[in-house]
Every structure is written in C-alpha cells, then in structure tokens.
C-alpha cells in the first residue's frame, strides 16, 4: 500500500508522491477563507483586542502570557528533544538549561495569573481538584485519561 512505512531493515517508505499532489494556490485560498478577520487584518485585530479589553479582560497581559508560555515551553522541549533523539547528553549543563527555561515558563505563567487576578496557589488547587475528580482513586487510569466526563477539560 502506498505510504506504508517499513520500520524493519531501515528501508525508505514506499511513497507515491503523485497520490497527494495539492494545488498550492487553491490551498492558499482555502486557508485564507477559513482564517478569521482578526488573524489577517490589523484593524480587525485591534478591534478584537479593544472588545476583549472592554469586556474586562487584561488581554494584553494574557496575550503576552500565551505567546511566552508557548515559546518558552518550546525551548524547554527543544532541549529534551535533542537529548532523546539527537544524542545531547544528560549532564549538569543541560539540566541547568532546562531549569532556566522552566523559570522562563514560570515567568509567563505568573503573567497569566496576574492577568486573571489569581494566584499560583489557585491554579494548583484547581488542578488538584480537577484531577481528583478524573481519578477518584488517586491513581492514573488510561481509560479515564482518554474518556473524559462531560465538563472535564
């Protein structure tokens, strides 16, 4: 079957590249069509921010937090990825680098807490309560991790 990967013998996958030819100009039109106005138009973006600020959100700080948590989390993951898949060693230097990146993540987490007017204790307590409901016996369960009850985010 085209596209199957042979994981034995380190052979290249048997892929017929013509099976999945895409008209990139049509794809670009599709992507543009399913993109919200605030994502592609500056004035709509500003109006969206103004509307959210008018609703009482601290959107500028939330946006800072969201972008920062994602970026710094990616840097943390990059170190782990290189250790697991690219031969980077587990050593004091890499451990310290992970701690530094984790500190950067926490800085942005605190930005989010400040934007939401909550404490880190509130976040942790809420997380513990959520997980107690998901795992009432106090132990991980694969089924419950994949099959959530209604309202379990």
Where are the model-predicted features located?
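Flexible "arm" and connector segments at domain edges
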Residues: 2-153
